[in-house]
């Protein structure tokens, strides 16, 4: 059985988001086990939860966020009835500032946009990309 790489998770803080609630755009990139049709829409509804909060400096904190979800996609083998799935279950961090010690930190996800990324001439690709807006509220 082959070894699969972890997803690359890249959170970006929205411009102007300097106080709670903080707004992030989270990009999840994952190499799929099998090639998928670039034209087919993969399904991925990630769940996000706050795992922990750590102080890293005066007024500076890092929230460890857990993401979990299943990517469902149609492989490029002509068999539309044969959907494949691949699990993502990982942690990533979101930095934030707070003048007081946080007593509660929550995360809420917006609607994810999912694609199979490929070049113009490619009909199949293993590159799955998902974008999800997140709101991090600190109290």
Briefly describe each language-model feature range:
Residues 1-139:
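Viral structural modules
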């Amino acid at each position: 059985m082959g070894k699969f790489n972890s997803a690359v998770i890249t959170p970006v803080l929205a411009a102007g988001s300097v106080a709670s609630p903080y707004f992030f755009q989270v990009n999840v990139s994952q190499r799929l086990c099998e090639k998928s049709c670039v034209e087919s829409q993969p399904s991925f509804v990630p769940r996000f939860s706050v795992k922990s909060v750590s102080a890293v400096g005066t007024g500076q904190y890092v929230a460890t966020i857990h993401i979990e979800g299943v990517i469902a996609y149609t492989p490029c083998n002509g068999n539309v009835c044969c959907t494949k799935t691949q699990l993502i279950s990982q942690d990533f961090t979101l930095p934030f500032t707070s003048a007081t010690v946080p007593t509660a930190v929550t995360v809420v996800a917006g609607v994810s946009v999912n694609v199979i990324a490929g070049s113009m001439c490619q009909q199949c690709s293993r590159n799955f990309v998902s974008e999800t807006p997140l709101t991090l509220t600190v109290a």
